[in-house]
Protein backbone atom coordinates (compact mmCIF):
# COMPACT_ATOMS: atom_id res chain seq x y z
CA UNK A 1 0.00 0.00 0.00
CA UNK A 2 2.83 2.37 0.89
CA UNK A 3 4.56 1.67 -2.43
CA UNK A 4 1.29 2.18 -4.31
CA UNK A 5 0.76 5.59 -2.70
CA UNK A 6 4.36 6.59 -3.38
CA UNK A 7 4.01 5.63 -7.04
CA UNK A 8 0.55 7.18 -7.38
CA UNK A 9 1.53 10.56 -5.89
CA UNK A 10 3.76 11.64 -8.75
CA UNK A 11 5.21 15.13 -8.87
CA UNK A 12 2.62 16.11 -11.50
CA UNK A 13 -0.20 15.06 -9.16
CA UNK A 14 1.37 16.89 -6.23
CA UNK A 15 1.63 20.04 -8.35
CA UNK A 16 -2.00 19.56 -9.44
CA UNK A 17 -3.08 19.26 -5.81
CA UNK A 18 -1.18 22.45 -5.05
CA UNK A 19 -2.90 24.25 -7.96
CA UNK A 20 -6.28 22.95 -6.68
CA UNK A 21 -5.57 24.25 -3.19
CA UNK A 22 -4.42 27.67 -4.44
CA UNK A 23 -7.50 28.06 -6.66
CA UNK A 24 -9.78 27.23 -3.73
CA UNK A 25 -7.83 29.58 -1.46
CA UNK A 26 -8.13 32.43 -3.96
CA UNK A 27 -11.87 31.81 -4.34
CA UNK A 28 -12.28 31.83 -0.56
CA UNK A 29 -10.23 34.99 -0.07
CA UNK A 30 -11.74 36.96 -2.96
CA UNK A 31 -15.27 35.55 -2.83
CA UNK A 32 -15.78 35.68 0.91
CA UNK A 33 -13.09 38.08 2.09
CA UNK A 34 -13.63 41.09 -0.18
CA UNK A 35 -16.57 43.17 -1.27
CA UNK A 36 -16.14 41.92 -4.84
CA UNK A 37 -17.77 38.63 -3.80
CA UNK A 38 -20.92 40.47 -2.77
CA UNK A 39 -21.38 42.53 -5.93
CA UNK A 40 -24.46 41.87 -7.99
CA UNK A 41 -22.43 42.00 -11.21
CA UNK A 42 -20.54 38.75 -11.79
CA UNK A 43 -18.22 40.44 -14.30
CA UNK A 44 -16.31 42.22 -11.52
CA UNK A 45 -16.02 39.01 -9.55
CA UNK A 46 -14.86 37.01 -12.58
CA UNK A 47 -12.29 39.67 -13.49
CA UNK A 48 -10.77 40.02 -10.02
CA UNK A 49 -10.84 36.29 -9.36
CA UNK A 50 -9.16 35.54 -12.70
CA UNK A 51 -6.48 38.18 -12.17
CA UNK A 52 -6.00 37.07 -8.56
CA UNK A 53 -5.55 33.42 -9.46
CA UNK A 54 -3.25 34.38 -12.33
CA UNK A 55 -1.04 36.48 -10.04
CA UNK A 56 -0.96 33.78 -7.35
CA UNK A 57 0.01 31.28 -10.04
CA UNK A 58 2.85 33.52 -11.24
CA UNK A 59 4.15 34.53 -7.81
CA UNK A 60 3.47 31.41 -5.70
CA UNK A 61 2.67 28.33 -7.80
CA UNK A 62 5.20 28.54 -10.65
CA UNK A 63 8.32 29.13 -8.50
CA UNK A 64 7.39 26.33 -6.11
CA UNK A 65 6.11 23.83 -8.68
CA UNK A 66 8.97 24.25 -11.14
CA UNK A 67 11.73 24.33 -8.50
CA UNK A 68 10.45 21.64 -6.10
CA UNK A 69 8.69 19.13 -8.35
CA UNK A 70 9.90 17.42 -11.51
CA UNK A 71 7.04 18.17 -13.88
CA UNK A 72 6.78 16.16 -17.08
CA UNK A 73 4.52 16.08 -20.13
CA UNK A 74 4.79 13.19 -22.59
CA UNK A 75 8.12 12.20 -21.03
CA UNK A 76 9.64 15.68 -21.46
CA UNK A 77 10.75 17.51 -18.32
CA UNK A 78 9.14 20.97 -18.21
CA UNK A 79 11.30 22.50 -15.47
CA UNK A 80 14.11 23.45 -17.87
CA UNK A 81 11.80 25.41 -20.16
CA UNK A 82 10.43 27.38 -17.19
CA UNK A 83 13.87 28.28 -15.83
CA UNK A 84 15.51 29.14 -19.15
CA UNK A 85 12.98 31.76 -20.29
CA UNK A 86 13.95 35.37 -19.69
CA UNK A 87 13.02 38.88 -20.73
CA UNK A 88 10.12 39.49 -23.07
CA UNK A 89 9.20 35.80 -23.31
CA UNK A 90 8.80 35.60 -19.53
CA UNK A 91 6.59 38.72 -19.49
CA UNK A 92 4.49 37.32 -22.34
CA UNK A 93 4.17 33.98 -20.54
CA UNK A 94 2.99 35.78 -17.39
CA UNK A 95 0.33 37.67 -19.38
CA UNK A 96 -0.79 34.41 -20.99
CA UNK A 97 -0.99 32.85 -17.50
CA UNK A 98 -3.31 35.64 -16.31
CA UNK A 99 -5.43 35.35 -19.48
CA UNK A 100 -5.64 31.57 -19.08
CA UNK A 101 -6.77 31.99 -15.47
CA UNK A 102 -9.45 34.47 -16.51
CA UNK A 103 -10.71 32.17 -19.29
CA UNK A 104 -10.78 29.26 -16.86
CA UNK A 105 -12.73 31.29 -14.29
CA UNK A 106 -15.23 32.25 -17.01
CA UNK A 107 -15.70 28.56 -17.90
CA UNK A 108 -16.23 27.64 -14.24
CA UNK A 109 -18.74 30.48 -13.82
CA UNK A 110 -20.65 29.36 -16.92
CA UNK A 111 -20.70 25.80 -15.59
CA UNK A 112 -22.21 26.93 -12.29
CA UNK A 113 -24.68 29.19 -14.11
CA UNK A 114 -25.83 26.48 -16.51
CA UNK A 115 -26.11 23.83 -13.79
CA UNK A 116 -28.31 26.16 -11.74
CA UNK A 117 -30.47 27.02 -14.76
CA UNK A 118 -30.85 23.34 -15.64
CA UNK A 119 -31.83 22.39 -12.08
CA UNK A 120 -34.26 25.32 -11.87
CA UNK A 121 -35.98 24.18 -15.06
CA UNK A 122 -36.10 20.55 -13.94
CA UNK A 123 -37.52 21.45 -10.53
CA UNK A 124 -39.73 24.24 -11.91
CA UNK A 125 -38.18 26.88 -9.64
CA UNK A 126 -37.75 30.60 -10.39
CA UNK A 127 -34.72 31.43 -12.55
CA UNK A 128 -33.15 33.52 -9.76
CA UNK A 129 -32.94 30.53 -7.39
CA UNK A 130 -29.37 29.40 -6.74
CA UNK A 131 -29.32 25.70 -5.87
CA UNK A 132 -25.56 25.20 -6.26
CA UNK A 133 -23.78 28.25 -4.87
CA UNK A 134 -20.10 28.83 -5.48
CA UNK A 135 -17.82 27.42 -2.80
CA UNK A 136 -14.05 26.83 -2.68
CA UNK A 137 -13.96 23.01 -3.07
CA UNK A 138 -16.29 22.83 -6.04
CA UNK A 139 -14.74 25.88 -7.66
CA UNK A 140 -11.21 24.52 -7.25
CA UNK A 141 -12.20 21.13 -8.66
CA UNK A 142 -13.86 22.65 -11.72
CA UNK A 143 -10.99 25.13 -12.11
CA UNK A 144 -8.41 22.33 -12.09
CA UNK A 145 -10.46 20.29 -14.55
CA UNK A 146 -10.84 23.15 -17.04
CA UNK A 147 -7.25 24.36 -16.56
CA UNK A 148 -5.90 20.86 -17.24
CA UNK A 149 -8.01 20.50 -20.39
CA UNK A 150 -6.99 23.94 -21.68
CA UNK A 151 -3.29 23.40 -20.96
CA UNK A 152 -3.34 19.97 -22.65
CA UNK A 153 -5.03 21.48 -25.71
CA UNK A 154 -2.42 24.24 -25.82
CA UNK A 155 0.38 21.67 -25.52
CA UNK A 156 -1.06 19.61 -28.37
CA UNK A 157 -1.31 22.72 -30.55
CA UNK A 158 2.32 23.63 -29.75
CA UNK A 159 3.46 20.08 -30.57
CA UNK A 160 1.54 20.11 -33.83
CA UNK A 161 3.10 23.47 -34.75
CA UNK A 162 6.60 22.15 -33.96
CA UNK A 163 6.03 19.05 -36.09
CA UNK A 164 4.76 21.17 -38.97
CA UNK A 165 7.79 23.49 -38.75
CA UNK A 166 10.22 20.55 -38.58
CA UNK A 167 8.75 19.04 -41.78
CA UNK A 168 9.39 22.26 -43.70
Cite the ranges covered by each PLM segment.
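Alpha-helical transmembrane segments and their membrane-interface junctions
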Residues: 29-33, 100-125
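N-terminal first transmembrane alpha-helix
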Residues: 1-76, 132-137
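Loop-to-transmembrane boundary segments
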Residues: 9-20, 83-106
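Short hydrophobic helices that act as membrane-entry/anchoring signals
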Residues: 2-11, 15, 69, 93, ...
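Cytosolic juxtamembrane helix at the C-terminal end of the final transmembrane segment
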Residues: 66-75, 144-168
